Amino acid sequence: MARVTVEDCLEKVDNRFLLVMLASKRVKQLFKGARPLIDNRGANKNVVVSLREIAAGKIGCEIGKKGR
């Protein structure tokens, strides 16, 4: 597999800080036993898997106003 870069992920998520939050949340999910949404035969670490999922468009986020 090709290397995943921050630039690949920023095509899907506009903000670097949001990217970090999204990736860290996904890493926690993977650590707790969630199944990867991409092929992980290379036994990549959870951080790499989460970034690959974001770059592939398998994971995203929505930002909206908080309701009361």
From Swiss-Prot:
Gene3D superfamilies registered for this protein in UniProt: 3.90.940.10
GO CC terms, sorted: DNA-directed RNA polymerase complex
This protein's UniProt keywords: DNA-directed RNA polymerase, Nucleotidyltransferase, Transcription, Transferase
InterPro entries found in the cross-reference section: DNA-dir_RNA_pol_omega (IPR003716), Pol_omega/Rpo6/RPB6 (IPR006110), RPB6/omega-like_sf (IPR036161)
GO molecular function: DNA binding; DNA-directed RNA polymerase activity
GO biological process, one term: DNA-templated transcription
EC number: 2.7.7.6
PANTHER family noted in UniProt: DNA-DIRECTED RNA POLYMERASE SUBUNIT OMEGA (PTHR34476:SF1)
Annotated NCBIfam families: rpoZ
Family membership noted in the UniProt record: Belongs to the RNA polymerase subunit omega family.
Subunit field text: The RNAP catalytic core consists of 2 alpha, 1 beta, 1 beta' and 1 omega subunit. When a sigma factor is associated with the core the holoenzyme is formed, which can initiate transcription.
Protein name: DNA-directed RNA polymerase subunit omega
Provenance organism: Citrifermentans bemidjiense (strain ATCC BAA-1014 / DSM 16622 / JCM 12645 / Bem)
Gene giving rise to this polypeptide: rpoZ
